[in-house]
Amino acid sequence: MVKQLCILGSTGSIGTQTLDVIRAYPERYSVYALCAHRSIDKLVEQALEFHPEVVCIADESLYEPLKERLSSLNCKVWAGAQAIAEVVTMPSIDIVVAAMVGYAGLQPTIEAIKAGKTIALANKETLVVAGEIICDLALKHHTPILPVDSEHSAIFQSLVGEDRSEIEKILLTASGGPFRTFTLEQMKTVTAADALKHPNWDMGAKITIDSASMMNKGFEVIEAKWLFGVPVEKIQVLVHPQSIVHSAVQFTDGAIKAQLGAPDMRLPIQYALSFPERLASDFPRVDLFALKDLTFEQPDLNRFPNLGLAYDAMRRGGNIPCVLNAANEVVNLAFREGRCRFLQMSEVIADTMAKATFIAKPVYEDYVATDAEARSIAEQILNLKS
């Protein structure tokens, strides 16, 4: 049976690579809905190729031009954040690929879980912000959440057939990003253009900056805690510059299982869509004979304090991970716009975490309020520093 997909963030890096997978298996997958923020040209191009039933754009000001440009298609055209949250619940949809960037992915993911859709999760901020709510809802509605992140896919694959109570440690690998070998002095003057030159992965701008600052890895620690039910004390980050070992699990008997592969996001995307099957592909293979070495290093929290801030946010709990995410979204954008220096980002995040209102047992409405408050605090701190 052909599975019907809704792709949230179809014009972004994960969204476009998901469409690559769908092109390779037209007998297995069909695009039911395409949703994007505001990249109207790419969205129109995708709609004309895949003929979805629904096309949705978050930016309501683009509704009329989008509708006009898709007038030749027999499809529904919707606009707005609420429309995206409604699209994911449509009965014909089997899998929702949650690839929207940042906090914007939270509400539609919640609605998709409530509707019982299989979730292929690429939006890690959803679990960073509201991991407890997401996991409780998934359990209540018997909704599978399949990780798309290469690291969490590797952990997931390493745990197939294993008892999770026998996990001793999760070994979460990180490339180290473009500034892995930089001194603090060198990092004082790096620019967004420098940070966007990732050595191994092809990703969107926001996540590439997060990778450079190692906030992305901090988010992945939090994501792993919720996905696999492991306390953060049992999650160890290893800097692995070659990006061949995507992550590993160490068990209570001392054995380690790892997943290796070329740094190509289409592989974990395909696995999330096809699980529990594996589909034959022509993706690049790793030639083990050609590998000179596989190295692993301790992360340097002095040069990359964002990773430590993520661990701290999880230990404090409550709404603090939501504060962490909101402040990071503010400084990430500010850095890309030249309003914030690279090393300043962690300072603003730490100050925001110290000043934001703490809520020990947040509900959904608390997360919404926390996100708004933390963004406001972070902007105020940025203005004072500029």
Residue locations for each model-derived region?
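Catalytic, metal-anchored helix/loop core of enzyme active sites in primary metabolism
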Residues: M1-S386
